[in-house]
């Protein structure tokens, strides 16, 4: 039988809250899964998707956590230095989450984590993975939208074949060339 319990990271600068779902038996060599909130949606996830996913992971034998970063859902506002960038704050918060899970479940020697995220949760997972060797995988949905050459090709091709801008330009040209009397 899986168990769900409240998860808290209590630091002087911030306090984070979430729900951790435990499998019947925790296997120390198995990675645990962390799901940071996405955008303004708290740890329940879009249409409770994070709830359903963490429960399914626990039934499959994985320790799984859904958590709110600062200023979202149940978590507090940060009380510390304003000189940190948003990325630095996010990485610090997620590393504190990993540290707390590792301490609570005595996973010091085998700590591996897979991050799962939707949209900004995916981006935050990627940022953490770049900085923290404990992250062994990322499952990201709607991760990044880079504006590369194909983006611009599609964008401008659509613009060229839209009729209304051409008509508006033609009307402006005629209006300037032949003033209305």
Task: List each model region and its residues.
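N-terminal cap/lid segment of alpha/beta-hydrolase-fold proteins
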Residues: 1-31, 87
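Short, surface-exposed "cap/lid" segments of acyl-processing enzymes
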Residues: 24-68
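The alpha/beta-hydrolase serine catalytic core
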Residues: 134-181
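Glycine-rich "HGGG/HGxG" loop immediately N-terminal to the catalytic nucleophile
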Residues: 67-84
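Alpha/beta-hydrolase fold nucleophile elbow
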Residues: 105-118
């Amino acid at each position: 039988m899986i168990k769900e319990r409240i998860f808290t990271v209590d630091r002087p600068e911030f306090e984070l809250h979430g729900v951790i779902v435990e499998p019947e038996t925790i296997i120390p060599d198995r990675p645990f899964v962390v799901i940071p909130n996405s955008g303004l949606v708290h740890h329940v996830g879009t249409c409770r998707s994070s709830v359903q996913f963490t429960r399914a992971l626990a039934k499959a034998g994985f320790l799984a956590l859904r958590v709110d970063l600062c200023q979202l859902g149940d978590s507090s506002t940060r009380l510390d230095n304003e000189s940190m960038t948003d990325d630095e704050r996010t990485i610090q918060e997620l590393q504190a989450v990993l540290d707390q899970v590792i301490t609570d479940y005595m996973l010091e020697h085998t700590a591996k984590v897979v991050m799962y995220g939707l949209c900004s949760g995916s981006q935050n997972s990627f940022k953490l993975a770049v900085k923290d060797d404990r992250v062994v995988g990322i499952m990201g949905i709607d991760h990044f939208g880079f504006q590369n050459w194909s983006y611009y090709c599609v964008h401008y091709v659509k613009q060229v074949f839209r009729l209304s801008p051409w008509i508006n330009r033609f009307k402006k040209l005629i209006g300037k060339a032949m003033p209305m009397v």
